[in-house]
Amino acid sequence: EISECLVGSEMCIRDSYHYMIDLTGGPCIYKRISGCGSGTEYMAVTPWGDLYPCHQFVGDPKYLMGDIWKGVTNTAVRDEFKHCNAYARPECKDCWAKLYCSGGCAANAFHATGSIRGVYEAGCELFRKRIECAIMMKVAEDSAKANG
């Protein structure tokens, strides 16, 4: 079991930083819902000045948002990304991990399903496992502190 490895081995813990999720703090609720902010809060800028919602969409003409001279001219792409969040995906509605993954990565969803609003199932399963392991590690850490 992954969590047993993580709890039982300092070396394994150092090598598994992706399981180190801040369960008690973390981002504000807005970021927990909206995720990374691709296409709305930040954009990828190419060496030629083109603007894309994320580096993973660079070169795809469908996702070209504009350029650094004219700004965002393709507002439809921005609006599409604005609605990419934990509550916009019906599949996320009842998921216990939605406020940790924020609905997942739009680029991963696009590559898996052809839509930025799709759901990358393998990514969901991996993220839920990360959260489970983080919870297990937190419980073990708190237990070790309590037991001296």
Label the model's feature ranges.
Residues L51, V58-G148:
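Flexible mid-to-C-terminal extensions adjoining Fe-S/redox cofactors in radical SAM and related proteins
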Residues C36-G39:
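Short, small/polar residue-rich loop motifs at catalytic or cofactor-binding pockets
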Residues R14-G26, Q56-K62:
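Flexible glycine/acidic-rich beta-alpha junction loops that bind and position SAM and/or redox cofactors
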